Amino acid sequence: MTLRRGSCPLLLFSLVGLLTTCAQEPDAAGQNTTAVAEKAGTCPQAELEMPDRNCTEACQSDAGCEENKKCCRTGCGTSCQIPDEKPGSCPNVDTPIPPLGLCKTTCSKDSDCSETKKCCKNGCGFMTCTTARP
């Protein structure tokens, strides 16, 4: 192959255009390959048996969801959902005597708790909504 004079800039511009196009191509999941910050928490488990299945692709990534909601699979689509697990960790429960009035289960997962509270062990074998440690 012989290159004619003046053809190198054309070749260079073609390569730059190709690299720019490849960098913006969506990946196999249909999301852009540029990194988008993922929000904290884990998506609720998608229900496999749903009578009226919602197959709508309501979001592409967590960035498309408001507040602390995450873009989660719904069985055959996606939707913005409140995550099961919230950021932070449960406080240590080291009391030899369990706190009065808290010996009952009030939650089973973080999404059962309001705002930033987490579902944690309460010292007497049950789970309750507690303020999380950072």
Swiss-Prot record:
InterPro entries according to UniProt: Elafin-like_sf (IPR036645), WAP_dom (IPR008197), WAP_four-disulfide_core (IPR050514)
All copies of domain WAP, residue ranges: 36-82, 83-133
One Pfam short name: WAP
GO MF annotation: an example: serine-type endopeptidase inhibitor activity
SMART domains: WAP
GO biological process, one term: venom-mediated disruption of cell wall in another organism
Annotated signal peptide: 1-23
Subcellular location: Secreted
Domain of life from the UniProt record: Eukaryota
UniProt-listed CDD domains: WAP (cd00199)
A single GO cellular-component term on record: extracellular space
Disulfide bonds: 43-72, 55-76, 59-71, 65-80, 90-120, 103-124, 107-119, 113-129
SUPFAM superfamilies membership: Elafin-like (SSF57256)
Main location: secreted
Tissue-specific expression: Expressed by the venom gland.
Keyword tags: Antibiotic, Antimicrobial, Disulfide bond, Repeat, Secreted, Signal
Job of this protein: Damages membranes of susceptible bacteria. Has no hemolytic activity. Not toxic to mice. Does not inhibit the proteinases elastase and cathepsin G.
Family according to the record: Belongs to the venom waprin family.
Protein name: Waprin-Phi1
Species this protein is from: Philodryas olfersii
